[in-house]
C-alpha cells in the first residue's frame, strides 16, 4: 500500500475543482481511483475526510451537493413531478467510498460492488438547497483486490432521507495486474 502523500498532498477537504481533477484521473496518479465526470459526478465538494474518524473509527467522509432546479435529472425524473433518483444518491455514496480508498493510499480503479441494504425515507426535490452525504468506513481489505465497506446516510436540508448499509467498493490495479473485480 502507498501512503496518501506518495501521489498527492492529502487535505481534509476538497473543492469542486479538486473533484473534477480526480475525474480526469490526475489526482491519485495514473491507473488509480478517479471520480466520474459531470453530469454523473454527484457531489460539489468534500468537506471532511479522515483515516480514523466515523462511527467505526476507520474513516469518515462528508460530501455535499448543491441542489438547483436546473439539475439534469429533474428534467426527466419525472416531468411534472421532479425528484432526484434515489439510485443517484446511492451512486454518490459509492463515489465517496471509492474516493476515500484512493485518498487513503489504495491503488487501482474503482467499481461499486454492491450494498447490503438501502432505505429511502424521503425525497430530494428541486426546492431543496443542500444534500449532505455522510460516510463511515467499516472495513478495508487491501491486497489483490482493495475493498472498502461503509455505511452511509444522505440528508437534504438537514432531513435524513436515505440510508445505505454495507456499501462495497473495490479497486482493481489495472497497471500492476493485481486481480480482477468480481463480475457485477
Swiss-Prot record:
Q: What does the record give under GO molecular function?
A: (3R)-hydroxyacyl-[acyl-carrier-protein] dehydratase activity; trans-2-decenoyl-acyl-carrier-protein isomerase activity
Does the keyword section mention Lipid metabolism? Answer: yes
Q: Which CDD domains match?
A: FabA
What's the short name of a Pfam family annotated to this entry?
FabA
Location in or out of the cell: Cytoplasm
UniProt keyword Isomerase present: yes
Q: Which GO terms describe its cellular component?
A: cytoplasm
Pathway named in the protein's UniProt entry? Lipid metabolism; fatty acid biosynthesis
Q: Per the UniProt record, which EC number(s) apply here?
A: 4.2.1.59, 5.3.3.14
Q: Which UniProt keywords apply?
A: Cytoplasm, Fatty acid biosynthesis, Fatty acid metabolism, Isomerase, Lipid biosynthesis, Lipid metabolism, Lyase
Annotated GO biological process = unsaturated fatty acid biosynthetic process
Under catalytic activity, the entry for this protein gives: a (3R)-hydroxyacyl-[ACP] = a (2E)-enoyl-[ACP] + H2O; (3R)-hydroxydecanoyl-[ACP] = (2E)-decenoyl-[ACP] + H2O; (2E)-decenoyl-[ACP] = (3Z)-decenoyl-[ACP]
Catalytic residues of the enzyme:
77
Instruction: Please report which protein family the annotation says this sequence is part of.
Output: Belongs to the thioester dehydratase family. FabA subfamily.
Subunit structure, as described in the record: Homodimer.
Purpose: Necessary for the introduction of cis unsaturation into fatty acids. Catalyzes the dehydration of (3R)-3-hydroxydecanoyl-ACP to E-(2)-decenoyl-ACP and then its isomerization to Z-(3)-decenoyl-ACP. Can catalyze the dehydratase reaction for beta-hydroxyacyl-ACPs with saturated chain lengths up to 16:0, being most active on intermediate chain length.
What PANTHER family does the record tag this protein with?
Answer: 3-HYDROXYACYL-[ACYL-CARRIER-PROTEIN] DEHYDRATASE, 3-HYDROXYDECANOYL-[ACYL-CARRIER-PROTEIN] DEHYDRATASE
What is the recorded name of this protein?
A: 3-hydroxydecanoyl-[acyl-carrier-protein] dehydratase
| Source organism (scientific name) | Hyphomonas neptunium (strain ATCC 15444)
Amino acid at each position: 500500500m502507498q501512503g496518501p502523500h506518495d501521489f498527492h498532498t492529502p487535505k481534509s477537504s476538497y473543492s469542486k475543482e479538486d473533484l473534477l481533477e480526480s475525474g480526469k484521473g490526475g489526482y491519485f496518479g495514473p491507473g488509480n481511483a478517479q471520480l466520474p465526470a459531470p453530469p454523473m459526478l454527484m457531489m460539489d465538494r468534500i468537506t471532511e475526510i479522515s483515516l480514523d474518524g466515523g462511527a467505526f473509527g476507520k474513516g469518515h467522509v462528508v460530501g455535499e451537493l448543491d441542489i438547483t432546479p436546473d439539475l439534469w435529472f429533474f428534467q426527466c425524473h419525472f416531468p411534472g413531478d421532479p425528484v432526484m433518483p434515489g439510485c443517484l444518491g446511492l451512486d454518490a455514496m459509492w463515489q465517496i467510498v471509492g474516493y476515500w480508498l484512493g485518498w487513503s493510499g489504495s491503488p487501482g480503479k474503482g467499481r461499486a460492488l454492491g450494498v447490503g441494504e438501502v432505505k429511502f425515507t424521503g425525497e430530494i426535490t428541486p426546492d431543496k438547497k443542500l444534500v449532505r452525504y455522510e460516510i463511515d468506513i467499516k472495513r478495508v481489505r487491501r491486497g489483490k483486490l482493495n475493498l472498502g465497506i461503509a455505511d452511509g446516510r444522505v440528508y437534504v436540508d438537514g432531513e435524513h432521507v436515505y440510508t445505505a448499509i454495507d456499501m462495497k467498493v473495490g479497486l482493481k490495479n489495472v497497471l500492476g495486474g493485481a486481480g480482477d473485480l468480481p463480475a457485477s
